[in-house]
Amino acid sequence: LYTCALCTKIGRYGIISNNVLQKGKGRSTVSEFSVSLAKLAEEANLTTAYTPCELDKIQVTATEVYRPGILLAGYYENFDNKRIQIIGLTEMSYLDELSTSLRNTHLEKLFSFQPPAVVLTRGMRPMSEMMQYAKQYGVPLLMSTEMTSALMGQLITTLNTELAPRITRHGVLVEVYGEGILILGDSGVGKSETAIELVKRGHRLIADDAVELRRVSYRKILGTAPANI
């Protein structure tokens, strides 16, 4: 039995943290995996102000989101256009104070980078210029009623889970007293039988035979059954 320290508990998943997953320790902000913008919008309860196509056709690969305050001030260096852009009350207030010409310049620059989406928080409606440049450059423009920090936290959590580096191991994953336990061993040594005995005692079976492990952060590994099994 390999007992893994509990980090947290998310729904039907068992959460484990150990050195079982070696890949992904130095992962960059861009993942080899992707998640559809439609799934992110559903998870975060986002509404659509404009989209050039169905949201499920747009894939997001960056594990972070970005508030483009410094870009709207005219600094464009090192801008990562793979991140979802979040515009909160601070950015909107700043844009309101700019002259029409300067506001158009900075907004056009933002949308010309063609990020996966631009999201307005706190129930704010997009400016007419935002709609204009969203249509011109084909950038989805979404809205949320959440506070900016709350929405960013939710999106980052979802992105870290969906885009996490992952491997599949032969074994059985159970949850015992809230802790994820990964049972490893050769075929026929009794992994499934051990899991059955634990289930009889009121514990939960998470995955049998094949276990998908995702490193959702540097200290957490998420274990679940592979989606295609």
Labelled PLM ranges:
Residues Y2-N19:
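Short, positively charged and aromatic/hydrophobic N-terminal segments
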Residues A207, R214-I229:
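Conserved nucleotide-sensing/catalytic segment adjacent to the nucleotide-binding pocket
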Residues L110-P116, K135-G138:
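Short, surface-exposed connector motifs at secondary-structure boundaries
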Residues E179-K200, R204-L205:
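Glycine-rich phosphate-binding P-loop
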Residues R125-T158:
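Charged, amphipathic alpha-helical linker segments immediately N-terminal to NTP-binding catalytic cores
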Residues T158-G178:
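P-loop NTPase nucleotide-binding/switch module
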Residues G26-F111:
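Gly/Thr-rich phosphate-binding loop signature of adenosyl cofactor/nucleotide-binding cores
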Residues R83-I86, P116-V119, V139-L142, G180-L182, ...:
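Structural motif
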